[in-house]
Amino acid sequence: MSFRRALSLACGFAGGSAVLVCAAVVADKNGYFGEGRRVTETLAAVNAAHPPAWPTANGWDYNWDKREPSSMVNGKRKESTGENGSQDAENNKPRATRHIFLIRHSQYNLKGDGDKERFLTPLGREQAEFTGQRLASFGLKYDTLIHSSMTRATETANIISKYLPGVELVSCDLLREGAPIEPVPPVTHWKPEAVQYHEDGARIEAAFRRYIHRADAKQKEDSYEIIVCHANVIRYFVCRALQFPPEGWLRLGLNNGSITWLTVRPSGRVSLRALGDSGFMPPDKLTRT
């Protein structure tokens, strides 16, 4: 293979690595490389231009929610009957998709001494109206509206529910705001005590396991669920669901009243259809408190 032909082939693979390829051409012109070495050096330079793959030990974990069908087969029953468990696995196989809308509460009174005094501001109530209208505009049949038991999340959920008549409202203490895991890199403006990570982290992880998982095998139709909670909780949920390093949660930003849309397929695959969408609000109504 001639050097020019090899270089042409390398260009096809390289995409945006034109600078490195041009450097190899100059080297060839000046006779710095032998024919065989020129090809090797060029391809090596092209490969070096590509970003390294993120190091993962096992790739995607399809049993991340401990609901992969084959993992739910009763081992003792399998041994006693001599069956291969394939029928049980088939019976446990989900067939529906879960759509989970994670809503951050609206702007609230930051000067309140406790939760009861940290109610929504007039702007926050207006933001919740926009969010409710946006969710209603999708034309979806929502199954439930779950919300954190904290005042600002409860008030946000109550306003949203006006636009979704007939959707059940459910309060949950597990969804309360907290410190899920120590963020990396650390920040100077927010440093909870270690005990707070210990207490909040276990609770928020429990909330994740309760609400973020593939559908039950008995579920026949796709579901659409709304969860109104807090920025830290939502960001942690997103990192966990996508199998990103969970300690990176604080690198994400969410506006008040924004919509984050997670989809969990029967196979266990998870996709993020929207992160912190607040484009349905006028620019002068956007806040991040």
Swiss-Prot record:
InterPro entries: His_Pase_superF_clade-1, His_PPase_superfam, Mito_Ser/Thr_phosphatase. The keyword Transmembrane helix applies. The chain crosses the membrane at residues 5-27. GO terms for biological process: positive regulation of mitochondrial fission; programmed cell death. It comes from the Eukaryota. Its EC number is 3.1.3.16. It is found in: Mitochondrion outer membrane. Keywords: Hydrolase, Membrane, Mitochondrion, Mitochondrion outer membrane, Necrosis, Transmembrane, Transmembrane helix. The keyword Endoplasmic reticulum does not apply. It catalyses: O-phospho-L-seryl-[protein] + H2O = L-seryl-[protein] + phosphate; O-phospho-L-threonyl-[protein] + H2O = L-threonyl-[protein] + phosphate. GO terms for cellular component: mitochondrial outer membrane; mitochondrion. It is a single-pass membrane protein. Phosphorylated by the RIPK1/RIPK3 complex under necrotic conditions. This phosphorylation increases PGAM5 phosphatase activity. Its main location: mitochondrion. Residues 68-96 are annotated as: Disordered. Pfam families: His_Phos_1. One of its GO terms (molecular function) is protein serine/threonine phosphatase activity. Belongs to the phosphoglycerate mutase family. BPG-dependent PGAM subfamily. Displays phosphatase activity for serine/threonine residues. Has apparently no phosphoglycerate mutase activity. May be regulator of mitochondrial dynamics. May be a central mediator for programmed necrosis. The N-terminal 35 amino acids, including the potential transmembrane alpha-helix, function as a non-cleaved mitochondrial targeting sequence that targets the protein to the cytosolic side of the outer mitochondrial membrane. PANTHER family: PHOSPHOGLYCERATE MUTASE-RELATED, SERINE_THREONINE-PROTEIN PHOSPHATASE PGAM5, MITOCHONDRIAL. This is Serine/threonine-protein phosphatase PGAM5, mitochondrial. It comes from Danio rerio. The gene is pgam5.
